[in-house]
Each structure stands twice: as structure tokens, then as C-alpha cells.
Amino acid sequence: MHVFDAAAVHAALPWPFLIEALRKTHFGPMPASDVVVQSDPAGGEAQFVTLPGWAPGGPVVVKMVGVFPHNAALQPPQPAVQGLVALFDGKTGGPLLAADGAAMTARKTAADSALGAAILAREDVEDLLIVGAGALAPHFAEAHMAARPSLRRVTIWNRTAARAEAVAATLREKGIDATVSGDLDRSVAGADVVSCVTMSDTALVKGALLRPGTHLDLVGAYLPHLREADDAALARGTIFVDSRNNMEGGGDLSQAVASGAITWESVKADLFELVQGKREGRTGRDQITVFKNNGGAHLDLFTASALSETLG
């Protein structure tokens, strides 16, 4: 069995390779998957989540992840999300590889949104706004730039400016033109692509400010009480999701449905339908596209399978 630490995961899965691997696997069927959530028996906010997935005639993945929101306050700080991803032979059950869970999550989550942008964003986009400055932020900037090479500039906004500057500095070290925004509304109005990677429980992106042709990527609101974009953003945009199977769990769509701004029928397609050509993506230059990244064990399986390909 091969073991990949975080550095090995990132090195083995460059963005162009992984985005293309995800595109190819979306030509196949949706794998069987499940989610088992164990809440902290002491009553705290922490959770331990197990996500198994099994492709028909293919391998089995099990992602084991701890979500501990207060880890950032520890000394020294630790990631809020940690775990392991294990891949098994679907015929024998034998273990094939184990990989650092945080690195795998960062890679697959960013590549998921990047594939959405590759299909839905205009081909001439230049300005990318990343809303949020957590661990995923630099990965989302790099993945989007790989998916849409026309992107020239990255702006980072975060409630804590110092954290935004740290992300921007990391990107500049890699030769990316990255700056910090002190005015979210102005940056939203000036962006071609807006990618939200936060844990916000109130809407940050105002739909009225989105200019025609913008691509809006929503990632962080994976629980019903979380929200990254307001009703106007969902109502103005044409909505797409990575998978219809788990699209009702996050707050952006479910809250907009509850308010009457949209219906579940407003979701035009998921990545399987888009990749397979069963549904249309962007149909006009001025169309606002909204992509809701919900994640799921199928993406862990696709990413782990891509990692196994690198073993030869």
C-alpha cells in the first residue's frame, strides 16, 4: 500500500491533470456513496465524518475526516479539517493507498470548482475574486487560473485583512498578480469570476452587484444555516451544481428556495449532465452563471483514483 503525505499529494496532482481527470470520470455513472456523521458526544461543535464511495466495477474510497472548528485557536494552530483518504481494490477489498485528508480535500474541492469554471465561465475572463482567506483560498486561485488561463489578476477579500494579505503573498511568491481588497462590494462588481470559500452564516455577495457575464462559485455554505450569496445572486444567475444528489444540504440554495427566490427546478444541470452533453451550460456572453460546489464522496473517489494513476 502506498502512503502519500500532504506534500506528495500536492506534487502528484497538478491542477491541469486533476481537472482533466475529474472531467473524464464525470463521463461515467455516479458512484454509490454515503455519509456518516458522528457528532461530539460531549456536546461540542466537533464532528467526525466518514464518507464511503464505490464505483460500479471500480475501486472503493473511504474518507475519514474530523471537523474541529476551534483548532485555529490552539497553540500552535491546527487545521480545522484533518483526516485520511483510503482507496481499496473494488474486486478484492485490498488497500491500495492512503493519503493525507486535508491535502486531498483541498485538491478535489478546488478542482471541482475549477471544472465548473472551465465549463461555465467565459473564455476571456481576466479578474478573479476569492472571498475568504482560509486554507483553501490559494488552492482555489491556482485551480481557477489553470482552468481559465485567461485569468490575469487575483484579488483576495477577507474580514481579517492580514489573513487576506498572507494568501496574496503566498500567491505572489508563485508569480501570480495577487492583491488584497478592502471593499468587497466594489471587488464583486469588478470581477469576472467570484469564488467564495468561507464559513459565513450571512450572505456576503450581493447579486445586484454582479455584472453581466460573471461566473459565481459558491463553496463554503455546506450546512443549512450557512450562506455566501443573497437571494438576488441566485435569482439573477443560471444555477448549476456539481451533483444533484446532495444539492439540498447547503444554505445558499435551500435558503433561497425557502424564501421563494428560486425553486429546486431552477438548478439547470450538474457536472455529470454538463460533461456528458445532456444539458447546456453557458448560453450567452452576458449570462450570470452560478456553480454550487457541494462536494461528496464521489469526488473523493475520483481524486483518489487519479492519485492511483500516478503510481503507474
Regions inferred by a protein language model and the residue ranges of each:
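Glycine-rich Rossmann-fold phosphate-binding loop(s) that bind the pyrophosphate
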Residues: 133-134
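N-terminal Rossmann-fold NAD(P) dinucleotide-binding loop
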Residues: 137-138
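Rossmann-like adenosine-cofactor binding region
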Residues: 174-256, 261
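NAD(P)-binding Rossmann-fold cofactor-contacting core
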Residues: 147-174
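Conserved beta-strand elements of the Class I
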Residues: 128-129, 289
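N-terminal ligand-binding/catalytic initiation module
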Residues: 1-106, 114, 124, 298-301, ...
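Adenosine-phosphate binding glycine-rich loop
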Residues: 224-312
